[in-house]
Each structure stands twice: as structure tokens, then as C-alpha cells.
């Protein structure tokens, strides 16, 4: 058989090739690619010849004058070790420090308009200098999350092991590649004017941090707001100019949950109920020092999404029935928003607030329909939701060269021992005696004095009549 046929070999399940009965002389292995459906994400070194020689004693040795190459080593036991490299990508979302979710850093909960911080950790392969493509793409549904492109920072280590910050346009380019459906950024390390910092990071990690803003259209169900990043890199090291470079892709995901609360407002007059529109409530949140962020330089103002919310004073909280003590002003409460019931037909009497983080909330009714009594105290609207995300974990590349490291398998919401699903809080107002509002307190006071005067007048009249009869 021809020489090419005899020595064309494929690695076994252990990554080994065995060639026997070689005669004295010089030989070389050249990688040409993967067998069909055997893609593993390792970069093919097909511009490297693994040269070796069989000497007079039948030993495997390095040929005289061979160029040193760190991609392979000739061992003393007649074997050769060849090194192939591949990068890695890990995506994490910064938690709100509430102890909720899984431990891996892939899920958390936030409020609409909150700034959500993400971290991408990239392992840089040792042969990155030989690659044509090395870039990161991060994609989000723009109705749920939107990148803050100016927040991107990239750091790593230089050749001396010192911390270094990568410079935009020099060490990488940053491009907004969003479309009508998605918010997307692309970080291309091969498009910068210098590769020095990238090459110095070979065999080490670089860290990318950036933020996104949770949008009003964020999903409030167990589907959550999933977003992903993928690292694209060349499959081989000898991509020529103009040659097609279909890269490998490593994908990783993270999810942000958010919740909602709502009201179904009913009016009751005897045995008759109807849905009430135009009823107003204020929603208050109990301050949680672990998860609610104070405005920098203040002790009484919370940053809630894009809002600045001041704590109620002890007197204000007590007047609303929020159980604050004047001495300590604990717990602290702040107003989140105002809800007004609206809707038509069967949807009348409804009001909802989307995009709330986990926490303790109360509703305080501030206005109701004419003829109905205001509630005498606040209504619990707590979102004490424990969520758990189960991930499908994978380490196999598909036949088209993609690795989906993590995908959401199932998500559960729990309220104590019970499954949690959203349901509006049904609140009932009852018909009551409705004094005219014109004149306010003065009218009520005058009415009371008038009654006393009439009664007193009757008493005087009766007294006078008795005296006359006498």
C-alpha cells in the first residue's frame, strides 16, 4: 500500500495513536482535522509538523537540527505527547446577597430599572497568537434586559504577571451589534491594533465585566430573563487570508428573575359585590440592608431601580400602620409606587406592578369610591419567593462545533413549602356612612355643635314650660 494510506491514523477513545514496526529514519505527524462527528473544541495544529526520528537502536528521538516546539514532547519511553489547546468561557451574574437561588452564580433577582452586573471569565488558550478569530458575543432579549455598553471593562495579567487593563480599540474593539429583538455587544480581540496583552494572557484568564438594565417588559414567571454569551474562536491555527473561518462557539447562560404584585379590588354592599375602578394604593417596601442599596453618601435614601426613595419617618410609618417605633424607627419603610385600579368588564378593579425584587411589601389604600370606607390598615403584599434553577450541564460539542455549557432545565418558585404562582390580592371595601366632604373637619365639628345646641334648646324650653305651669 502507499505510504499515505499506511500512516493515516485516527486517535482512539483515549486520544492515542499507535504506529508499529517503523524503520530507522525521520518521520512526522501532521494534524489534518477531526473525524466526522468527533469535534471536541480543541484547536487543530495543522501548521505544525510533529517531527521525530527512529535511531539505530530503534528509539524515538528528536531529529538533529529540529526547531524546538512546545506543542509536543518526545518522551523517554518511545512515546510522543502532543498538546492541543482550547479556551473556555464562564458567565456569572452578581447576586443581590439575599441567599436566594443556586450557588453557581447563574441566577438572581432584581427590580425593573435595576443595574445588573455580569462577569465573563475567559480562559485564553496557549496558542491564541496563531488564531484568526477570538471574540465574545453577549446577547439579551431587549424587552427584558439592555446592555450598558459604556460599562464594559476588561482586565488580565501581562507577561510579568502584573494586573493590566485592556484598552478599547487598542486591545479589542467593542461594537453594538443589536437588532430589532436583541440587545447585543461584540468584543473582538483580534480587531484591535495590538495583540500584545492578549498574547501575554495565553494560558491565563481575562475577566470582562459589564452591566445591563432590567427592562419594564421583563418576564415575571419561572421562565425568567435568560441571556447568554458565547466565545468564538478558530478551529485551526493556519487560517489563510481569504479562507473561510467557521469558528467553534462556547456558550454559557445566566438568568435574572423578577416578580409582580397586584390587586383585585371589590366593593361590597350587603350581599352584592362589584369590581371597583379608581381605587388608589401606595406600595411600600421594608428596607433590607443586605439587598437594598443606599444612595452613596446618604443613610436615608434607597436606590430602587432608577428611583431615589426616602425612608418614611417614624411618625409617618406609624400613622400608616407600618409598625415602626418612634424611638428606633425600625423597621424602615420606603414608598415604591402608587397603583390605581382600572380595566373593563371582568378585568375591572385590577392594578399590577411588574418587576419587583423579592422582599416584604405592604399596600396602603389612600382613596376609594364614594360611599365605601377606606381600609383601616395596610395589606400584606409580600414577595417572599424562594427560587431554584436546575441547569442542564453539558461538556460535549455538537457536530456543528457548538458547546452549550448550561441551559435552564426547570425553575421552581416556592413560598414556604408551597409552590408560588402569581395571583392578585383580593381586597374588599364595604359600603359605609358617607358624610359630605364640603367643609371638611369644620363641617363635622359644626354639625356636632348644632346637635348639642338643639338638645340644649329643647331642655331650656321644657324647663321654662315647667316653671310657667308652676
Predicted regions and their residues:
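Solvent-exposed loop/turn and edge beta-strand elements of beta-rich ligand-binding domains
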Residues: 1-470
Amino acid at each position: 500500500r502507499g505510504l499515505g494510506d499506511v500512516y493515516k491514523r485516527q486517535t482512539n477513545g483515549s486520544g492515542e495513536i499507535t504506529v508499529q514496526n517503523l524503520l530507522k529514519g525521520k518521520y512526522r505527524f501532521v494534524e489534518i482535522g477531526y473525524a466526522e462527528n468527533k469535534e471536541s473544541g480543541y484547536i487543530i495544529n495543522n501548521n505544525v509538523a510533529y517531527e521525530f526520528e527512529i535511531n539505530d537502536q530503534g528509539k524515538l528521538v528528536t531529529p538533529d537540527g529540529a526547531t524546538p516546539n512546545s506543542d509536543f514532547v518526545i518522551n523517554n519511553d518511545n512515546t510522543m505527547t502532543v498538546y492541543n489547546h482550547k479556551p473556555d468561557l464562564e458567565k456569572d451574574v452578581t447576586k443581590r446577597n439575599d441567599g436566594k437561588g443556586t450557588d453557581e452564580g447563574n441566577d438572581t433577582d432584581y427590580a425593573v430599572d435595576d443595574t445588573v452586573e455580569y462577569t465573563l471569565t475567559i480562559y485564553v488558550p496557549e496558542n491564541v497568537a496563531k488564531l484568526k478569530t477570538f471574540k465574545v458575543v453577549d446577547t439579551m432579549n431587549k424587552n427584558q434586559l439592555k446592555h450598558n455598553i459604556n460599562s464594559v471593562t476588561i482586565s488580565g495579567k501581562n507577561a510579568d504577571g502584573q494586573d493590566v487593563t485592556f484598552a478599547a480599540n487598542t486591545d479589542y474593539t467593542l461594537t453594538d451589534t443589536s437588532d430589532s429583538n436583541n440587545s447585543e455587544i461584540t468584543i473582538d480581540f483580534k480587531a484591535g491594533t495590538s495583540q500584545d496583552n492578549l498574547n501575554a494572557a495565553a494560558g491565563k484568564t481575562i475577566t470582562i465585566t459589564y452591566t445591563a438594565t432590567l427592562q419594564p417588559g421583563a418576564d415575571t414567571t419561572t421562565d425568567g430573563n435568560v441571556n447568554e454569551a458565547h466565545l468564538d474562536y478558530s478551529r485551526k491555527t493556519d487560517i489563510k487570508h481569504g479562507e473561510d473561518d467557521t469558528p467553534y462557539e462556547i456558550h454559557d447562560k445566566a438568568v435574572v428573575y423578577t416578580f409582580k404584585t397586584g390587586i383585585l379590588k371589590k366593593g361590597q354592599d350587603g350581599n352584592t359585590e362589584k369590581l371597583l375602578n379608581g381605587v388608589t394604593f401606595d406600595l411600600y417596601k421594608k428596607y433590607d440592608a443586605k439587598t437594598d442599596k443606599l444612595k452613596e453618601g446618604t443613610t436615608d435614601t434607597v436606590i430602587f431601580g432608577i428611583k431615589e426613595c426616602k425612608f418614611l419617618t417614624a411618625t409617618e410609618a406609624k400613622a400608616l400602620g407600618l409598625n415602626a417605633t418612634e424611638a428606633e424607627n425600625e423597621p424602615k419603610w420606603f414608598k415604591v409606587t402608587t397603583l390605581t385600579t382600572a380595566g373593563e368588564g371582568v378585568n375591572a378593579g385590577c392594578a399590577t406592578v411588574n418587576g419587583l425584587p423579592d422582599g416584604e411589601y405592604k399596600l396602603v389604600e389612600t382613596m376609594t369610591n364614594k360611599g365605601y370606607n377606606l381600609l383601616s390598615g395596610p395589606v400584606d403584599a409580600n414577595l417572599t419567593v424562594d427560587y431554584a434553577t436546575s441547569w442542564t450541564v453539558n461538556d460535549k460539542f455538537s457536530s456543528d462545533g457548538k458547546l452549550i455549557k448550561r441551559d435552564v432545565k426547570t425553575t421552581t418558585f416556592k413560598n414556604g413549602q408551597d409552590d408560588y404562582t402569581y395571583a392578585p390580592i383580593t381586597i374588599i371595601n364595604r359600603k359605609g356612612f358617607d358624610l359630605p366632604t364640603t367643609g371638611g373637619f369644620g363641617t363635622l365639628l359644626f354639625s356636632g355643635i348644632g346637635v348639642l345646641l338643639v338638645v340644649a334648646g329643647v331642655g331650656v324650653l321644657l324647663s321654662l314650660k315647667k316653671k310657667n305651669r308652676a
